[in-house]
Regions:
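Catalytic phosphate/metal-binding cores of nucleic-acid and nucleotide-processing enzymes, i.e., regions
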Residues: 1-108
Length: 108
């Protein structure tokens, strides 16, 4: 997971996307990273390849979404680049669709 996160962060920076590690003392299961570009904020959970978010992480993602936030998760570099390209080039509709589709898949 750490190697994938490092690669994603390097890629985001190469696109001029601001990123920070997200921690919230007293709150578990928050997404790993915050990415910001063009006034759009994206929370992203980064998983080990083949792994999915825990129920607690899915719950936290649902809370973020319920207040209008954009949040998703990835377990590979290809999916991460799709999220980041959408963020960088303000493809907001695509970004929202990606986030919404993931959440629908997880609730099925």
């Amino acid at each position: 997971e750490a190697q994938l996160e490092k690669k994603i962060v390097q890629f985001a920076k190469s696109l001029g996307i601001y990123t920070r590690k997200f921690t919230s003392p007293g709150h578990r299961a928050v997404p790993d990273r915050i990415f910001v570009s063009g006034g759009i904020v994206l929370f992203l959970e980064i998983k080990t390849p083949g792994k999915k978010p825990t129920q607690a992480q899915l719950h936290e993602m649902a809370l973020i979404t319920s207040v209008g936030g954009l949040v998703g998760w990835v377990d590979n570099f290809t999916d991460a680049t799709a999220f980041l390209f959408s963020l960088r080039y303000k493809l907001t509709a695509d970004l929202k669709r990606r986030c919404k589709n993931q959440q629908q898949e997880e609730t099925q």
